[in-house]
Design a protein with these regions (language model features):
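Rossmann-like adenosine-cofactor binding region
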Residues: 271-372, 377
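General beta-strand structural signal in soluble alpha/beta enzymes
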Residues: 167-171, 194-199, 242, 265-268, ...
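Buried hydrophobic packing segments
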Residues: 111-114, 184, 220-228, 252, ...
Length: 454
């Protein structure tokens, strides 16, 4: 008779071996699935029907994967070809929902990992949304507005046949902001001759929701607030290191400042800035203008504010801080970075990006018993507010910023409570990874079982 531990170990080993055989070379996807498997399999064995129905095996297999060519013409008149993707992972609890990423690193593995993570994140929001992700290996960086528009129109010309307000509702992600959403929505409307909430992140005057740009960064701070409260702490007076300088990082920095923290760093792919005095409203106004209007590099910050320092080719995790908020990209915090953070006094890591910490880094955070939340929980504010935008579109109305912000706060508080429910361990330590994975998994799993083998 096998012991429970033996059953769990054998199942994990067999499951991951089969996954890697079926999905060779997809390291990001393997990593995302492995984290979920570690959390949910010990829970699954308590409910034999989940094993019998092979729910996890079905969950890691996308319902549909769409890959297509995206031809466009650059400003020199030369033809360029990029590759587009849409991974429609799971629709058990609602229409597919997930962002579109334009970045040179985009490949099928990254799209599948993001779509898999999105499924759990969307389930955590309590809103009826399935999981998906899309994108292209096209990078808007260095491209003219006209080139970006031509690419977006070509991309949407193919994608439009696979999406819809009740089928699949894309949004923005890295490389896809309001400009790109606008170009894609315009092309969708032209081709389909309909004005529906098929994309979220739209402009405020044509169906967008107030607070959508702020939502991911603000939501991460609201989640961090709830985490800190479990230890009788708050943002007030805390030193915060933030990576990234895009939408998520900008608004995480703004909200952390307004909650009384001293934000020390921002970064982009070239390096990071360290402002020992801390960012303030005036400095953030400059960052917004630099990144969103001029689309410049973060190193220009030190030209404007010479007291700050710029570190080329580095990440900000060696700067002493109390709270770290990785808001850039996947696997940006590695083992050495995690060791530096813990050694320098960091006691709270709240992820604003998707899977920004490697498994080795997460093990260090949890081993040190510091507060650590995975992106699927703490950065769910963005997709939650996208869901609220879908609701407003379907009702043909518009809520005030205060109404949206209050709903966002409630959703982040509910996600935190779900993490506590499923993630509190015997010694009282809250394992937010375990809590988020089990809470999201059970909602999707039960929906799949109840809907039959489809």
């Amino acid at each position: 008779m096998k012991t429970t531990d033996k059953i769990i170990a054998d199942y994990k080993s067999r499951f991951m071996a089969e996954l890697k055989t079926k999905n060779p070379g997809e390291t990001e996807f393997h990593q995302a699935v492995s984290e979920v498997v570690d959390s949910v399999v010990p829970y699954m064995v308590q409910y034999p029907y989940l094993m019998e129905q092979k729910v996890l095996e079905r969950m890691v297999e996308p319902e549909r994967v769409i890959m297509f060519r995206v031809p466009w013409v650059d400003d020199r008149g030369e033809i360029q070809i990029n590759r587009g993707y849409r991974v429609q992972m799971n629709s058990a609890i609602g229409p597919y929902k997930g962002g579109i990423r334009f970045h040179a690193s985009v490949n099928l593995s990254i799209m599948k990992f993001l779509a898999f993570e999105q499924t759990f994140k969307n389930a955590l929001t309590t809103l009826p949304m399935g999981g998906a992700k899309g994108g292209s290996d096209f990078s808007p960086r260095g491209k003219s507005d006209a080139e970006v528009m031509r690419f977006c129109q070509s991309f949407m010309t193919e994608l439009q046949r696979h999406i819809g307000a009740d089928t699949d509702v894309p949004a923005g992600d890295i490389g896809v902001g309001g400009r790109e959403i606008g170009y894609m929505f315009g092309q969708y409307k032209r081709l389909r001759d309909e004005f529906t909430g098929t994309l979220t992140g739209k402009g405020q005057y044509w169906g967008g929701s107030l607070m959508r740009p702020e939502a991911t960064g603000y939501g991460a701070c609201y989640f961090a607030e709830a985490m800190l409260a479990t230890r009788g702490e708050s943002f007030a007076g805390k030193r915060v290191c933030i990576s990234g300088a895009g939408n998520v990082a900008q608004y995480a920095a703004q909200k952390a400042m307004r909650l009384g923290a001293k934000v020390l760093t921002l970064s982009d792919s070239d390096g990071f800035i360290y402002d020992e005095e801390g960012l303030d409203e005036e400095k953030m106004k400059f960052v917004f203008e630099l990144k969103n209007i001029r689309r410049g590099r973060i190193k220009e910050y030190v030209t404007k504010y010479p007291h700050a320092k710029y570190f080329a080719g580095e990440r900000p995790w060696r700067i002493p801080c109390d709270i770290a908020m990785p808001c850039a990209t996947q696997n940006e915090i590695e083992k050495t970075d995690a060791e530096n953070l813990v050694k320098n006094g960091c006691f709270c890591v709240t992820e604003g990006a998707n899977m920004p910490s490697t498994p080795e880094a997460i093990a260090i955070f949890q081993g040190a018993k510091i507060l650590y939340s995975p992106g699927k929980a703490s950065n769910a504010g963005g997709v939650a507010t996208s869901g609220l935008e879908m609701t407003q579109n379907s009702m043909r109305l518009k809520w005030t910023a205060e109404e949206v912000d209050q709903r966002l706060r409630t959703i982040m508080a509910d996600i935190h409570e779900a993490c506590i429910k499923y993630g509190t361990e015997e010694d009282g330590y809250i394992n937010y990874v375990k809590g988020a994975n089990i809470a999201g998994f059970m909602k999707v799993a039960n929906a799949m079982v109840e809907q039959g083998l489809v």
